[in-house]
Amino acid sequence: MDPRTNPYAPGAGTIPPELAGRDEIIEKASIALDRCRNGLSSRGLFLVGLRGVGKTVLLTRISQEAEANGFAVVWIETPEKRSLPALLIPTLRTALLKLDKMAAAGDLGKRVLRVLGGFVGAMKVKYRDVEFGVDLGNELGVADSGDLEHDLAALFTEIGKVTKEKKTALVLFVDEIQYIEEEQFAALIMALHKCAQNQLPIILIGAGLPQLVGQAGRAKSYAERLFEYPTIGPLSQSAAREALETPAAKSNVKYEKDALGEILLQTQSYPYFLQEWGKHCWQYAKQSPITLNDVRSATELAISELDASFFRVRFDRLTPGEKKYLRAMAELGSGPHRSGDIAALLQKEVQAVAPTRATLIGKGMIYSPSHGDNSFTVPLFDGYMKRVMPNFNKLF
């Protein structure tokens, strides 16, 4: 069928044409934001899940609705090896300038910009990647000590006073939050805790891989009471069918029942893969309805494209030792797998491969669902490892 009218949208954080099965989490976030703005107790959210489940899509949709409803929105994505201040400062400045232009700005709006200026100066000394050329002035003695935990709490307190005065709330959206260094993560959690204690309207909506739950608890023990951790998983079968059928129906295209069943089987109902299969089914099929044979042919195309992009970009970041570790996991199946079983397959002691396991967790390739267990963070990655490294025995 015509590729120009293909409705499916596989992509990193691309909102699909039909955001099916996620109404409950969107409503949960909306309630939390409204309660925060109204001065009521509310917990932030950490959306937790594997790659390809649509965490970034949800953050984007929630942030769009927040901005449309008058919230002050700050969005950051936390790549590896960037400091939290370097990521926060530019986006906070933009949000504060918008707040300063709102009605009832008062002296607090000017003051908080000066406080941010002092924070910038202090962080430039401590973190080499903080680069900010605009002079905002400073408010001597506030958020300028150089101690991140103290200064971030002071900065957020001043911001909270402004948002409270203007009857709004600052919503901090943080994607890939698991990459924040633990000491900096602790400072962020403490700053938000301080705001919650003082009923100041600042709230965090974050997203990350499953290890985020443990990371937050290690950073600050009270994080479990400050945030909720909804799990974002594959879609239900009905939602998965809706994600495929609704966009197609707008162009009068239908799927045969067994064709839909085959897509759900191949994708395991993961949102990203549903979009990928939908795209290739549309492009392969000659006409409506899309048949089982169309899906089987499209499956080969979808897997080939995933191997060349979605999977490959992650594989290319790995060292030879890390590739062997993941290939051993794949040999055992989709997981989870005991560290001892992986080590035995690699013909090594558990302690010998522990550093490799640690770096793979740090890179976001695997996580530990329970002590001593290991699972892939990327769905279907075990199949890819077998395709890209087909002969496990030749690794030795």
Question: What is each of the regions a protein language model found here?
Answer:
Residues 139-210, 218:
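Conserved Walker B catalytic segment
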Residues 211-227:
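Short regulatory helix/loop adjacent to the ATP-binding pocket of P-loop NTPases
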Residues 122, 240-309:
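Amphipathic alpha-helical "lid/sensor" segments that cap RecA-like P-loop NTPase cores
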Residues 5, 43, 258, 296-300, ...:
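C-terminal leucine-rich, beta-strand-based interaction scaffolds used for sensing/assembly
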Residues 63-82:
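Conserved catalytic segments around the Walker B and adjacent sensor/switch elements
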Residues 107-153, 157-165:
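Conserved P-loop NTPase mechanochemical-coupling segment
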Residues 1-43, 394-396:
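A short, basic N-terminal segment
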Residues 41-61:
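Walker A/P-loop nucleotide-binding motif
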